[in-house]
Regions:
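Short, hinge-like loop/turn segments at secondary-structure boundaries
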Residues: 67-68, 91-92, 114-119
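Glycine- and acidic-residue-enriched helix-capping/strand-helix junction motifs
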Residues: 17-31
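Short beta->alpha junction loops
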Residues: 49-58
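Extreme N-terminal starter segment of soluble prokaryotic enzymes
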Residues: 2-6
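Mid-chain, well-packed structural core segment of small domains
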Residues: 71-106
């Protein structure tokens, strides 16, 4: 069986991890997190085709449209609460994805209770901090194994 591939998408402001509200999001940078994701993926026999971050909705959608992956891990940041277009793109590419959030948005400001992605994701991992990304990889690896 060919190695299963995963793309990791991070939305607006996640490039500021490590400095943006560290009391909420922690002190690890996005590059450090991407390193942990790549290391764990290797241990699980998965290939990370890209760890992509953009502050622009259209760039995230364009990356999805490349369809060069078997599954995705998506931390859409604030777009979670506003982007019908990102939801539509995730549905259009017809690849399973796990939604990840470092915090639990539903326990924060009222506007964060709206979520356009959770009901179309195969799972949502929220409030587990950086560990949520590796948990998403483990979930995808198990899913791939069951379907092999």
């Amino acid at each position: 069986m060919a190695q299963q591939t995963v793309v990791v998408l991070n939305g607006p402001n996640l490039n500021l991890l490590g400095t943006r509200e560290p009391q909420i999001y922690g002190r690890q940078t996005l590059d450090e997190i991407h390193g942990q994701i790549r290391a764990r993926a290797g241990e699980l026999g998965l290939e990370i085709v890209d760890c992509f971050q953009s502050n622009h909705e259209g760039a995230l959608i364009d990356r999805l449209h490349e369809k060069d992956f078997d599954a995705a891990i998506v931390n859409a940041g604030g777009l979670t609460h506003t982007s019908v277009s990102l939801r539509d793109a995730l549905l259009a590419v017809n690849r399973p994805f796990v939604e990840v959030h470092l915090t639990d948005p539903s326990t924060r400001e009222p506007f964060r209770k709206v979520n356009f992605l959770a009901d179309v994701a195969i799972a949502s991992i929220v409030g587990h901090g950086v560990r949520g990304y590796t948990e998403a990889l483990e979930l995808l690896a198990e899913r791939f194994k069951r379907r092999a």
